[in-house]
A protein has these predicted regions:
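Bacterial Sec signal peptide processing site at the extreme N-terminus
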Residues: 7-25
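Residue-level recognition of tetratricopeptide repeat
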Residues: 22, 56, 90, 124-126, ...
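Canonical tetratricopeptide repeat
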Residues: 28, 62, 96, 132, ...
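Structural marker of alpha-solenoid helical repeat scaffolds
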Residues: 52, 86, 120-122, 156, ...
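TPR alpha-solenoid repeat register
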Residues: 59, 93, 126-129, 163, ...
């Protein structure tokens, strides 16, 4: 009886290890396929990885990001929520979740996710988290908080074009046109040909500058 139990335990351990390795292979294959623009294959591979190793926060995070990139926002939110539940201290996952929630226009939930991300020492994109937090707060009409978040983002990354543009939106909403013009000019100066740079030109026209 004891021998049978031992054999069963060994077999189970080997099966678990085999699944873990298969999941890792599927994950790495999925990342390679994603880099090569093979989105459908990458999606299949990452889904295989999460199926083989459902306890991996990293695999759910990567799958969620790919789904978000493919515009499947609700599915992305579900995967990123699962990842955050598995590893609540993973700051980048919370940031990714906030981004997905913002795409779904769930602004309150996005604010909550960004604020949790900012509290995590593991977060690698603190400037972007504050920038995105500011934008979410702007959409909620919480302009003072939005301004604080965006100015903090710029203190961390003075060339962060999106933060200048979004701060311009915030001060425009607060009826501070001269400050808004300066911010939109700065947005344009950083990179005129980007979407933010071109949008800044239109904002300046709306404020009576240029033509």
């Amino acid at each position: 009886m004891a021998v049978a139990a031992l054999l069963f335990a060994c077999t189970s351990a080997k099966t678990a290890e085999m699944k873990r390795l298969q999941a890792q292979n599927a994950y790495e294959r999925g990342l390679t396929q994603a880099r090569q623009g093979q989105s459908a294959l990458a999606l299949s591979s990452l889904q295989e990885a999460t199926s083989l190793d459902p306890g991996s926060a990293l695999y759910h995070d990567s799958l969620g990001l790919l789904l978000l990139d493919l515009g499947r926002v609700d599915l992305a939110v579900a995967e990123l929520t699962k990842s955050a539940e598995l590893d609540p201290d993973r700051g980048d996952t919370l940031f990714h979740l906030g981004t997905a929630l913002a795409e779904a226009r769930r602004w309150e939930d996005a604010v909550s996710a960004y604020r949790k991300a900012i509290l995590q020492p593991s977060l690698t994109v603190l400037d972007l988290a504050h920038q995105n937090l500011g934008l979410a707060l702007f959409h909620l009409g919480r302009y003072r908080e939005a301004e604080d978040a965006l100015r903090f983002a710029l203190s961390l990354s003075p060339q962060l074009q999106a933060a200048y543009y979004n701060l311009g939106l915030v001060v425009t909403a607060q009826k501070r046109p001269d400050e808004a013009k300066a911010l939109f000019r700065r947005t344009q100066q950083i990179a005129p040909e980007t979407p933010f740079g071109r949008a800044a030109v239109e904002r300046l026209k709306a404020l009576g500058e240029g033509g």
